[in-house]
C-alpha cells in the first residue's frame, strides 16, 4: 500500500502522518491485534493492536527502519510530502480485488504536550475506535 501526504509543512510547522489500518475491516469498537498504527516522524513507530507505541517498559520502540514498511524520515525543513509504504504481508493480507480495509489518517505536530494538534481523515475518525474509520476496497 502506497500513501503520499502532501502539505506536511504548514506555516513553518512540520506535520507528521499517522496511518490507521484495520486489514480485515472488522469495525471493532476497540483495538484488537491485527489492527495497525503507523507513525512517520524522525523515526518510524508502529503498533499492532494499539496506537501510540513510542515506548514500552521504558524502552524506545521507534527506529529509522521497520520491517515490512517504510517512510521518508527524518523530514527536513523543506519536506513538502511524506511517503508511506506498507507491505500487505505486514498487514497479513493477500491483496485481491474486492478486499476491504478500514483506513484512517492523521497529521499531527507531535509535540506531546497541550499544544499538540491532530487533523483526521475522516474528520469523524477516533484513534481509539476502529469502527469510526472508513472503508477502502482494493481494486
Residue positions per predicted region:
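Structural preference for beta-rich elements and adjacent junctions enriched in aromatics
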Residues: 1-139
Amino acid at each position: 500500500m502506497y500513501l503520499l501526504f502532501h502539505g506536511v509543512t504548514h506555516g513553518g510547522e512540520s506535520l507528521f502522518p499517522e496511518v490507521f489500518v484495520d486489514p480485515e475491516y472488522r469495525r471493532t469498537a476497540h483495538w484488537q491485534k491485527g489492527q495497525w498504527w503507523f507513525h512517520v516522524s524522525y523515526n518510524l513507530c508502529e503498533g499492532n493492536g494499539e496506537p501510540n507505541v513510542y515506548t514500552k517498559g521504558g524502552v524506545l520502540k521507534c527506529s529509522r527502519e521497520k520491517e515490512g514498511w517504510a517512510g521518508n524520515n527524518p523530514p527536513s525543513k523543506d519536506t513538502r510530502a511524506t511517503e508511506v509504504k506498507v507491505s500487505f504481508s505486514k498487514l497479513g493480507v493477500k491483496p485481491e480485488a474486492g478486499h476491504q480495509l478500514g483506513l484512517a489518517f492523521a497529521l499531527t505536530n507531535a509535540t506531546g504536550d497541550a499544544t499538540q494538534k491532530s487533523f483526521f481523515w475522516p474528520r469523524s475518525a477516533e484513534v481509539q475506535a476502529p469502527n469510526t474509520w472508513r472503508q477502502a476496497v482494493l481494486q
